[in-house]
Amino acid sequence: MTTPERICLPGLPTTTDPAPVITQMVRRASSLGFETWWRRVESVGFCTHPIQLVGAGSVGSRQVVWTRCNNRRAAVCPSCSDLYARDTWQLVHAGAAGGHHNMPAEVAARPQVFATLTAPSYGTVHNATGARCHPTSTSPGSRCIHRKPLRCNATHSMGDPIVGQPLCGQCYDYFGHVLFTWHLPELWRRFTIALRRAVAAQLRARGMDRGLVRVSFVKVVELQARAVPHIHALIRLDPPSALTTQSDQNHYGPAATCGGGEPLSDTGSSGWVSPITAGELAALIQSAARQVRVDVLALDGDVRELRFGTQIDAQPLSGEAMGEPVGTGLMARLSPRRVAAYLAKYVTKSLQDFGITARRLSTEAIATLDVTEHVRAILTTITQLAECVRPMAGIGRWLHTLGYRGHITTKSRHYSTTMGALRAARATWTRRQNTKHVEHQGTTRPDWRNIPVTEVPADVDADDVLWKFDHAGHASAGERTLVYSAALQRIHTRQVGLVEARRQVRDQHGDPPGGHDG
């Protein structure tokens, strides 16, 4: 007798009983209000965790609005995650290649370096390099002080759950691991200060004014297989700028209240040539990253020095947007288009792969989590530091991020456009399309006072409505599964369309410089 195949529904844990969820799906799909509900779902791009707001207008009419959750994590909402990744691509590419989103085309000619700053080694872990993990050495009987073998002759794949796990958990420095994760934002801040000072010193050594160059950047934090974060950053040298204009305020937002000494506008910089080359910038990045230190209190009360690891990489970008020939190998991968796709891929990651949800955890929940012993040891170390080291008392609130308290994506003020500007432009476009649709229909507007809607009608001023949060998410797991499936289908359709469009472009004009973004 054969065992029937288990049904796995998209967006749900494999341990979920599918029968009641399927019943909910059928009930919703066969309901009288399905078409109205589906239009609402479609209006927010098949968001799987939509926010519902309710409000009353100046005349007392009730309005209901659905809006996206805008969560960047693919495990929470594939639709909003995909949109976040595409916005990130636009932001990074505009800053690297220019020519769109109010970024001048001249930025493509400026020195740019793609840098990766990693964490130090806190113990030997299993890896997936394509070769044997830790092959037997000349002394095959070598073991650690805990009598565990320091070798592994297996060749692990990227999906192997053992990748990133320490060969000996007792030898692994979990306190150093957690301290680095917690203080990584401060390490990055000090790195940017050190880099700006290094650039200024380079200019002074050549008898030039230190104000001739401004450092701009965008960075993305990625969690390695060993569950420690490292940084990918695209760093660019810009010309000095004029005073802030209203256009600066519109495009970049207000300046930081505490200052920062950054120039504000690229007005009149079309003929600027950087006195520092991309190769020299890469060397300055390497030097600055190696000299940065942060002294912190450890569990035993001693001072511990934190720093970046030895694997610091800094590679100049190629000149895709200027029509320069792009070679093969590394330089081909480091065109603006490639780097933008590379960074956009990482912003949608979450700790779901480590068995941790995006919601806050309690200390009591650590023992019951379905995670590896490595992750459990990290969580336990976080709680110990929160209890015993006074300056780190707040780390206990960041169990769900394994102690990382910074943003995944950050940028300097003038590197590129902002996520808010991209969303505002998209909202404006959507309103115009909806207005065109209503005008094309040539019908009288419905009575919005008695009909819940997914968007504020054009004849209702959103500023005159007092909006209140009503709830988030769908009414049942069945509804969420329907929406989740539709989101995946839309993403797949868009990707197929992009591949076909690029194929047609290649057939007509040949491969674009730098390749495509995948």
Specify the residue positions occupied by each region the protein language model found:
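Long, low-complexity, charged/polar intrinsically disordered accessory regions
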Residues: 1-85, 94, 304-518
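Hydrophobic alpha-helical scaffolding
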Residues: 177, 181, 271-275, 307, ...
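Helical (often loop-to-helix) elements that flank the catalytic cores of nucleotide-handling enzymes
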Residues: 234-301
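Histidine-centered divalent-metal-coordination microenvironment in nucleic-acid enzymes
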Residues: 77, 115, 208-246, 343
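Signature for HUH/AEP ssDNA processing cores
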Residues: 97, 101-223
